[in-house]
Amino acid sequence: MKIYTQRLEDISPDQAFETVELTFDTRQKSRFRAALASGVDIGADLPRTGILRSGSYIATQEGDVLRVDAKPERLMKVTAQTEFDLLKAAYHLGNRHVPLMLTPTALYFEPDHVLAEMVEGLGLTVTETDHPFEPESGAYAQHSHDHRLSPIKALHHVHS
């Protein structure tokens, strides 16, 4: 079994790699076992440096590269009649400190009937769906050098 032990910031355009789909729960762990689409078992024993985001690359000591993709999983999808109503739902869910994925037209969170009832009580629609889960990292998340979603941090970031 191949054991992946390194996180890669980037790979060269001509680098060959395999892919694996992992749930959010698994992508939070530094040690796990998984199966590739081909059925081949792999293991990971990675440094504890944060969540593997969809599109992350990991490698073995021998140089084998694997791209990690977010696996579709059962989620609660929140939709609203207005953007303001969706914003209110995001506020209330954020106050409960649950992992929350934001999109322009919907919010996604892991199944929780109590939270679903709360959101429905605000007048929003909650449905179950299968979708890849990439929740927001939050204001207090570990530092990363990926500033794609944060142009302000990128402009003011200083390495000491």
Swiss-Prot record:
GO terms for biological process: protein folding; protein-containing complex assembly; urea metabolic process. GO terms for cellular component: cytoplasm. Keywords: Chaperone, Cytoplasm, Nickel. GO terms for molecular function: nickel cation binding; unfolded protein binding. It is found in: Cytoplasm. SMART domains: UreE_N. The keyword Chaperone applies. Disulfide bonds: none annotated. InterPro entries: UreE, UreE_C_dom, UreE_N, UreE_N_sf. Gene3D superfamilies: Urease metallochaperone UreE, N-terminal domain (2.60.260.20), UreE, C-terminal domain (3.30.70.790). It comes from the Bacteria. Signal peptide: none annotated. Involved in urease metallocenter assembly. Binds nickel. Probably functions as a nickel donor during metallocenter assembly. Belongs to the UreE family. This is Urease accessory protein UreE. The lineage of its organism: Bacteria, Pseudomonadati, Pseudomonadota, Gammaproteobacteria, Moraxellales. The gene is ureE.
